[in-house]
């Protein structure tokens, strides 16, 4: 049996997405900026995707810009805001457990462009401390960036509450949300929640890789980071990736169809898995695992077994999981997220992330649990202390 439990790293594309991407590449392959029929046909896919995404988020189509993915969207939000608003201040705020796309961009702004960054602490469950956010705000603050769902432990941030604090202090501070793990799992309404910029990636919602988008409130002052042919109102130049755009639009439409049922399915499997894995001695579930946590992510520490060893043992049995953020997994290191939530030292290099999708089955979860029951005691027996 093959069991894919690494859906926070990437997802299997919907069949309908594969079909439309292939159709656009092979039949409707025109440049959407061209004036002839092939170009007009291609532009129709871009327009349809924008209509779909705008309807899901309840925003205006003109506030959406397609990018190469979540990382570029995050970069545009942070760098674009910093360069547009540096005269108003050079202080930025984020959390200590953000995705590397945020943390490394923040460090760049600190080290290369002279910005001051405050990294908010989180509680034991991975939620930002709102009192720390209040204390961090100052007259120099121009941006606050907080992720919707943590990609390692599944903590869900109090986005609306955080935005309210920021806007009460200064309505001109831009509030950015990395929603790469939250979009497709939650109904997100930027206008209602006080979100000025929102980053999304296609391949986390059963869409193509290499495509994402960013919502930027029409009133937000943001400078482009890529220059060229002035596509997308000069905010993101470069010929649009029409196959990817068609794919992400259809993926979003599909995932938000019967979303509540899909989320309930994942939550039930998550609870089933947690109840089963807790039967194994010396294990810990990192973060919350109730209804306030993400429906698809489970972070489990197995004391006495290195993450990499257990990961490859499961791989031999056809089970695919992750030892943390896949975006950093080629460079093994102790997780900053686990450190941030105060995880015990015995779990820092002994934790795996199991992440599900709507396609995950109870049979797959049972097989994974049975495999863990067999291999965890065996590996501990042969681990040197």
Task: Give a label for each model feature.
Residues 1-385:
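Pyridoxal 5′-phosphate
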